[in-house]
Every structure is written in C-alpha cells, then in structure tokens.
Amino acid sequence: QGYSSAASDVYKRQEYIGVDACAVNLMRPAMYGAYHHITVMGKEDQPCDHMYDVTGSLCENNDKFAIDRYLPKVDMGDLLVIHDTGAHGFAMGYNYNGKLKSSEILLHEDGSFEMIRRAETPKDYFATFDCFDIYNKINFDA
C-alpha cells in the first residue's frame, strides 16, 4: 500500500498604504465595508496597476479604507483623496484613542477646493473635560 503526500504553501505579498486619517474620520469602511473612491493627487491619469490595502492609523484591524484596491504607484508624501465622504465624516466621527477630528475639504466640480470645517485641536478636545481642573492646567499655546 502506497502513500502520496503533497505540501503547498501560498505566499501573498501585500502592499499597504498607511495614511494619517483613520476610522475616527470616516467610520463607514471599518463598520460595514462601505466603498469610497480613492485617488492619488497628481496621478489621476496614471494606470491603477498596483494593489494596496489603504489603512488608517488606529491600532484596530478593521481600520482600513480599502482592501485590495488598485491605485497608481504610491510614493511617500503622496496625497490620497478619499471621495464622497460628505455627510458621513464629521457626523459619524468620534475621538477614539484621543484622535482629533480632521478638517473637511470640499472639492468643487471645477477642481478648486475649500476648507469647510477646521481640524479639531487639543484645546477643543479637552474643553469638555470637567475633572481635575485639567483644562486650566494645560498650556495650549506651547
């Protein structure tokens, strides 16, 4: 009686793009896998021939804006635009892990843009603390 055995290993090389945004800024992809189009500024006309996971800065495994997303080659310092976040970013935002809410930028059809909500500051974050007199002890101007 003979035996036959085979072993197989599968290696998947995955490339990641870590961004300074996170689920605090846009919770929908982390909660239920919502799709948001992502572009790389200045590379809109380049081929989307590199596959990435676009990950946020939280220490949570579901803090991802995209999984297996084809984008142009992304280099350190490139700016990514996560589209169509309008009503969901700030309204669903929260301060998990002490993360501050980001500013909101409106991209107009003609390509111009404007800031419609400033970024949250540490002073904003601590303004509602009402214990240990912490707000008055922090030097926000340092």
Region roles according to the model:
Residues 12-17, 21-142:
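C-terminal accessory subdomain/extension
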